[in-house]
């Protein structure tokens, strides 16, 4: 029978894995939405809108696991920071998924209207590329942040150089 601490550590690791997977899903959704926008790909846009429910489901699962950890294990210190960080991150990542869906819906709307808004589209694509870079940094950094707060990124001492645009 595994020790209580080992089981708890495994739950924290599973939480980390789920959050990283959700980050990958949100990043892929942004990337697909931008591709749909660039190529006026209606089917890809529809698939992005449909996948949003998967990201929403991931948010609910992660929130549930975090609350279960808080209630059952009553974490303190660094473990509490890990769980509370996951609760905050999951909300932000879910919002990224929603915005990917919004971009995809814009593709559907623009296609239906047959408008030529090249200047606006270029700005949206540039912003989307910047968001995609930030999501990739988030996913890349989420593993060490949930396994232990990095001193260089601790609390308010975020190193903004970690977000190259």
Enumerate the predicted regions with their spans.
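Cytosolic, long alpha-helical scaffolding segments
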Residues: 1-165
């Amino acid at each position: 029978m595994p020790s209580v601490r080992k089981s708890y550590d495994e739950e924290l690791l599973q939480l980390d894995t789920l959050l990283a997977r959700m980050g990958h899903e949100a990043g892929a959704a942004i990337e697909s939405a931008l591709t749909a926008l660039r190529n006026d790909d209606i089917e890809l846009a529809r698939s992005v809108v449909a996948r949003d429910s998967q990201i929403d489901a991931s948010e609910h699962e992660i929130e549930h696991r975090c609350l279960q950890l808080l209630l059952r294990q009553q974490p303190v210190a660094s473990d509490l920071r890990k769980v509370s960080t996951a609760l905050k991150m999951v909300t932000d990542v879910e919002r990224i998924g929603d915005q990917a869906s919004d971009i995809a819906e814009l593709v559907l709307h623009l296609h239906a209207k047959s408008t030529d808004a090249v200047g606006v589209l270029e700005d949206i694509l540039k912003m989307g590329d910047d968001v995609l870079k930030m999501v990739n940094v988030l996913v890349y950094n989420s593993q060490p942040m949930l396994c232990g707060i990095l001193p260089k990124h601790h609390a308010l001492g975020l190193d903004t150089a970690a977000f190259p645009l």
